[in-house]
Amino acid sequence: MATDRRVARVAELIKREISQMLMSGIKDDRVGSGMVSVTDVDLSGDLQHAKIFVSIYGTEAARAETMAGLKAATGYVRSELGHRVRLRRTPEVVFLEDRSLERGTQVLSLLNRLSEERQKNADLDEMAAEEPES
């Protein structure tokens, strides 16, 4: 079992290498259909399994196509990772779509809408309080 510090260092190295592969190494056109970036790598304590979280910018169809391309390129990515990173055993690689940025944007828009509604209600309350009673 590797130490937490080593796991974090290896995960960061894997993230950097896979990001470079996405930019220049993977020839599958499906991977290029949406703008892809590696957001996180979750590496198991024994360094045998790596979950690669990717953020894909584009339409829903482009996202599905890009994920299919990444799943098809998993073998190549693992092989190339074995050449680039010196480990006793190359970890099994699984690509997962990270939608946290999208969810964060939705939450922010909801908060902004609530803030606007509260401001409107406060303005209406002030106007009602200022009206002279007849």
From Swiss-Prot:
Record flagged with keyword Cytoplasm: yes
PROSITE patterns in alphabetical order: RBFA (PS01319)
Gene3D superfamilies: 3.30.300.20
Compartment list: Cytoplasm
Transmembrane spans: none
Gene Ontology MF: a single term: ribosomal small subunit binding
Protein family membership: Belongs to the RbfA family.
HAMAP family tied to this protein: RbfA
Record note on quaternary structure: Monomer. Binds 30S ribosomal subunits, but not 50S ribosomal subunits or 70S ribosomes.
Role of this protein: One of several proteins that assist in the late maturation steps of the functional core of the 30S ribosomal subunit. Associates with free 30S ribosomal subunits (but not with 30S subunits that are part of 70S ribosomes or polysomes). Required for efficient processing of 16S rRNA. May interact with the 5'-terminal helix region of 16S rRNA.
UniProt name for this protein: Ribosome-binding factor A
